Amino acid sequence: ELMENSVDAGADQVTVVVMDSGRTLIQVIDNGSGMNPDDAVLCFERHATSKIATADDLNEILTFGFRGEALAAIAAVAEVTLKTRTEGEELGCQVEFAASEHLATRGTATPKGTNISVRNLFYNVPARRKFLKSDNVEFRRVVEEFTRVALTRPSIGFTLTHNGRDIFVLKPAKSLKFRIMDLLGSTVAKD
């Protein structure tokens, strides 16, 4: 969902950094539109969305996310730091949440776009943390989601790094066929 937010923000480059198959860190960095400080705090509230103003807007949605639940749900079970800046702002902002509690908001130097770090997933819900599968299984899920989003937007560059090692470095592609070749190899794309 973090990648989908980046795509929805108009990013043309999205980087995903994962440590320990996502248990320790999931970080998504983009060069999209970013958020102003008020929206950066508001986005962590349940059902907060900038995509629906009237009921008619539901028929016009062309984005991945619109319900305004993902960031609130993530912030409930992890330590989250969001850095963001819009084009017109000189200084960005940093917002910190843990276990649904708003810990801090402050100004920070950051590039245009959004950088969100999710640390210590399920640290406050030990029973849920126990249900995580092995690192291999959890990382396979990360790769599946990364691939799913990368396939939907071949014109966007995507990078996936795990434990300091680049897994995928996908440059913007001319078409879905070229993106499939980058992800799965030329033999699969021919089929």
Model-flagged regions — what are they?
Residues 1-191:
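N-terminal phosphate-binding caps/lids of nucleotide- and nucleic-acid-binding domains
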